[in-house]
């Protein structure tokens, strides 16, 4: 069998989908769509210096949409848009303990982009899993600030 439940295999506790990250080239225009047309509540905008990204967050109460715009030239988001265009950049899963998640993933030889948590938008501790390990999707794990 190729698939085992996480209880039998990794014991990684995923609390749910935290957000979907979308790379955009026009934050104001795209924000208008999510906020004014779809009427999703805008909760937060900030620049995350460590990632050179400006984030604008819309909360559906069952998951968030995080719009990502480069805040500096040569940022990861700018490169992504240049190479792949705008669109879904990553899926973020909330975990209860980011440090334990990193240990469990490394035990299973999962390739991480950063193996030490960084502070991301809204103060979450974050780590990214390389698309090589996920079937082509950039996955972010995030622990809510206490």
PLM-predicted stretches and their roles:
Residues 30-33, 101-105:
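Hydrophobic side chains in well-ordered alpha-helices
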């Amino acid at each position: 069998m190729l698939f085992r439940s996480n209880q039998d295999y990794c014991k990684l506790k995923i609390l749910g989908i935290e957000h979907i990250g979308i790379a955009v080239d026009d934050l104001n225009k795209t924000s208008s769509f999510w906020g004014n047309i779809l009427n999703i509540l805008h909760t937060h905008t900030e620049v995350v210096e460590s990632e050179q990204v400006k984030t604008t967050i819309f909360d559906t109460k069952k998951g968030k949409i995080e719009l990502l715009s480069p805040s500096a030239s040569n940022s990861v988001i700018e490169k992504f848009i240049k190479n792949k265009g705008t669109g879904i950049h990553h899926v973020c899963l909330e975990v209860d303990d980011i440090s334990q998640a990193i240990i469990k993933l490394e035990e299973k030889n999962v390739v991480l982009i950063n193996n030490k948590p960084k502070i991301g938008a809204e103060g979450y501790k974050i780590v990214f899993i390389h698309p090589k390990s996920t079937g082509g999707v950039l996955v972010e794990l995030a622990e809510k600030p206490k």
